[in-house]
């Protein structure tokens, strides 16, 4: 079915920063998508185009990307008369219009908006839910469909918070639930208990939440944070049903070849900085004491040696985010160096749906897991909820069970589970290999 109109506008994300919304019109209606935005902009990522005009939006405007959709992509896209059901053709067309390796001519935020809107239009044309269309595109098995374990970011440290705590995200994963709906209830109950305990121990303002909905108390060490979470799990009555995931974001505290766990202190003691081996030992001691099942970015993005050393003995899921930035060449290197065994998939890091699907397929082929992820600057768009079901990855990271831009995805997964009924299973303990269920 032909596309009669492509139109973009600037809207706002959950941090109050501009982002790109694209509308694509066919005979079936108007199909919309909003692009998320990350705080990180790694050198190996597709380029998120910002206007850099400091007199407006602190330089973060997206009018250039919006104009690229309206003045460059729109007319060419309509004229090309593409079949929106052929996502590869749509994305190849967008890539050829851009012509750069990192999408810097048109902007990954312009290209991705069109790519996602096209997928929504295609699902409508086929009269199927978006997740089913995405399963068709990725040639995923659909009997049964797999609902993911939500890795809920309930406590923040690192650059996302005050306090000395170096590690960035502490997540709870209700793997012991029987359904996604039960997982959400467990997650919600643990979250509320965590907020109460945090206020009790650190004062009322410690219950305030960060960009992704997690609490950010003035905590000094990882042990202190983990004790708080374990106490909240017990207080909620869900001991044994809830595991823990970490996102260390350790590129943030990598200095001169070592890791500074006191990086927020300008006077930090250099004699206490850790080598990669010493940091690995610290992770091992945490894994012995706490029910940790997944660690993301345990080392800096180019410290390959430390990644490979740790992976040999970790025995739990090791997720590559900064290491791979959803970039096929980086993923291939990580697979070859045996540095990790799971990919964090962020569609806007690579910039088209087809490339995102391929990144997941390459990872599955290497026996890796795939965790679909939001970004810190999110919107009400729920695309990744359908994507995680369509790709059958078994795990999603989309913030805390709080803040509407996070709940939008989690609520969409509740709807999908309800709609699928007995045609779906919850990944539970098998989150690492949802693709094999």
From Swiss-Prot:
<keyword id="KW-0324">Glycolysis</keyword>
<comment type="similarity">
    <text>Belongs to the enolase family.</text>
</comment>
<feature type="cross-link" description="Glycyl lysine isopeptide (Lys-Gly) (interchain with G-Cter in ubiquitin)">
    <location>
        <position position="358"/>
    </location>
</feature>
<feature type="binding site">
    <location>
        <position position="296"/>
    </location>
    <ligand>
        <name>Mg(2+)</name>
    </ligand>
</feature>
<dbReference type="InterPro" id="IPR029017">
    <property type="entry name" value="Enolase-like_N"/>
</dbReference>
<dbReference type="GO" id="GO:0006096">
    <property type="term" value="P:glycolytic process"/>
</dbReference>
<dbReference type="InterPro" id="IPR036849">
    <property type="entry name" value="Enolase-like_C_sf"/>
</dbReference>
<feature type="binding site">
    <location>
        <position position="247"/>
    </location>
    <ligand>
        <name>Mg(2+)</name>
    </ligand>
</feature>
<dbReference type="InterPro" id="IPR020809">
    <property type="entry name" value="Enolase_CS"/>
</dbReference>
<feature type="active site">
    <location>
        <position position="160"/>
    </location>
</feature>
<feature type="modified residue" description="Phosphoserine">
    <location>
        <position position="138"/>
    </location>
</feature>
<dbReference type="GO" id="GO:1904408">
    <property type="term" value="F:melatonin binding"/>
</dbReference>
<dbReference type="GO" id="GO:0004634">
    <property type="term" value="F:phosphopyruvate hydratase activity"/>
</dbReference>
<dbReference type="InterPro" id="IPR020811">
    <property type="entry name" value="Enolase_N"/>
</dbReference>
<comment type="subunit">
    <text>Homodimer.</text>
</comment>
<dbReference type="GO" id="GO:0032889">
    <property type="term" value="P:regulation of vacuole fusion, non-autophagic"/>
</dbReference>
<dbReference type="Pfam" id="PF03952">
    <property type="entry name" value="Enolase_N"/>
</dbReference>
<dbReference type="InterPro" id="IPR000941">
    <property type="entry name" value="Enolase"/>
</dbReference>
<feature type="modified residue" description="Phosphothreonine">
    <location>
        <position position="313"/>
    </location>
</feature>
<feature type="modified residue" description="Phosphothreonine">
    <location>
        <position position="324"/>
    </location>
</feature>
<dbReference type="GO" id="GO:0009898">
    <property type="term" value="C:cytoplasmic side of plasma membrane"/>
</dbReference>
<dbReference type="Pfam" id="PF00113">
    <property type="entry name" value="Enolase_C"/>
</dbReference>
<keyword id="KW-0460">Magnesium</keyword>
<protein>
    <recommendedName>
        <fullName>Enolase 2</fullName>
        <ecNumber>4.2.1.11</ecNumber>
    </recommendedName>
</protein>
<keyword id="KW-0832">Ubl conjugation</keyword>
<keyword id="KW-0456">Lyase</keyword>
<feature type="cross-link" description="Glycyl lysine isopeptide (Lys-Gly) (interchain with G-Cter in ubiquitin)">
    <location>
        <position position="60"/>
    </location>
</feature>
<feature type="modified residue" description="Phosphoserine">
    <location>
        <position position="188"/>
    </location>
</feature>
<keyword id="KW-1017">Isopeptide bond</keyword>
<dbReference type="GO" id="GO:0000015">
    <property type="term" value="C:phosphopyruvate hydratase complex"/>
</dbReference>
<dbReference type="GO" id="GO:0000287">
    <property type="term" value="F:magnesium ion binding"/>
</dbReference>
<comment type="pathway">
    <text>Carbohydrate degradation; glycolysis; pyruvate from D-glyceraldehyde 3-phosphate: step 4/5.</text>
</comment>
<dbReference type="InterPro" id="IPR020810">
    <property type="entry name" value="Enolase_C"/>
</dbReference>
<keyword id="KW-0963">Cytoplasm</keyword>
<keyword id="KW-0479">Metal-binding</keyword>
<dbReference type="GO" id="GO:0005829">
    <property type="term" value="C:cytosol"/>
</dbReference>
<dbReference type="GO" id="GO:0000324">
    <property type="term" value="C:fungal-type vacuole"/>
</dbReference>
<feature type="cross-link" description="Glycyl lysine isopeptide (Lys-Gly) (interchain with G-Cter in ubiquitin)">
    <location>
        <position position="243"/>
    </location>
</feature>
<dbReference type="GO" id="GO:0005886">
    <property type="term" value="C:plasma membrane"/>
</dbReference>
<feature type="binding site">
    <location>
        <position position="321"/>
    </location>
    <ligand>
        <name>Mg(2+)</name>
    </ligand>
</feature>
<dbReference type="GO" id="GO:0005739">
    <property type="term" value="C:mitochondrion"/>
</dbReference>
<keyword id="KW-0597">Phosphoprotein</keyword>
């Amino acid at each position: 079915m032909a596309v009669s109109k492509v139109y973009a506008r600037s809207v706002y994300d959950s941090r109050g920063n501009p982002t790109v919304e694209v509308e694509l019109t066919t005979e079936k209606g108007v199909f919309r998508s909003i692009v998320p935005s990350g705080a990180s902009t790694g050198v190996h990522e597709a380029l998120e185009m910002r206007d850099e005009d400091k007199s407006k939006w602190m330089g973060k405007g997206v009018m250039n990307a919006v104009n690229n959709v309206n003045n460059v992509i729109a007319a060419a896209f309509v004229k090309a008369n593409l079949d929106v059901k052929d996502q590869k053709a749509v994305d190849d067309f967008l890539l050829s219009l851009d012509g750069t390796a990192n999408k810097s001519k048109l902007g990954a935020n312009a290209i991705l908006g069109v790519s996602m809107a096209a997928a929504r239009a295609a699902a409508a044309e086929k009269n199927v839910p978006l997740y089913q269309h995405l399963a068709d595109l990725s040639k995923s098995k659909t009997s049964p469909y797999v609902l993911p374990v939500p890795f809920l970011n309930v406590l923040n440290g690192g650059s996302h918070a005050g306090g000395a705590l170096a590690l960035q995200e502490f997540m709870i994963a209700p793997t012991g639930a029987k359904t996604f709906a039960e997982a959400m209830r467990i997650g919600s109950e643990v979250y509320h208990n965590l907020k109460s305990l945090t206020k009790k121990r650190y004062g009322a303002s410690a219950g305030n939440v960060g960009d992704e909905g997690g609490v950010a108390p003035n905590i000094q060490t990882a042990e202190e944070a983990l004790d708080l979470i374990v106490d909240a799990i017990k207080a909620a009555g869900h001991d044994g049903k809830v595991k823990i995931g970490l996102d260390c974001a350790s590129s943030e505290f990598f200095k001169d070849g070592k890791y500074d766990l006191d990086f927020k202190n300008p006077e930090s003691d250099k004699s206490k900085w850790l080598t990669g081996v010493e940091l690995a030992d610290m992770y091992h001691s945490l894994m012995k004491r706490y029910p940790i099942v997944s660690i993301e970015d345990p080392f800096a993005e180019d410290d390959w040696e430390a990644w490979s050393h740790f992976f040999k003995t970790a025995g739990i899921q090791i997720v590559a985010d900064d290491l791979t930035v959803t970039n096929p060449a980086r993923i291939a290197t990580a697979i070859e160096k045996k540095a990790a065994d799971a990919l964090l998939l962020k569609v806007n890091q690579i910039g088209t749906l087809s490339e995102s699907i391929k990144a997941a397929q390459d990872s599955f082929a290497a026996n890796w897991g795939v965790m679909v992820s939001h970004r810190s600057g999110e919107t009400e768009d729920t695309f990744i909820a359908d994507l995680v079901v369509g790709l059958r990855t078994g795990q999603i990271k989309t913030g805390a069970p709080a803040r509407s831009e996070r709940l939008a995805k989690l609520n969409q997964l509740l709807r999908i589970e309800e709609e699928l009924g007995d045609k779906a299973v919850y990944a539970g303990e098998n989150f690492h290999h949802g693709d094999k269920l």
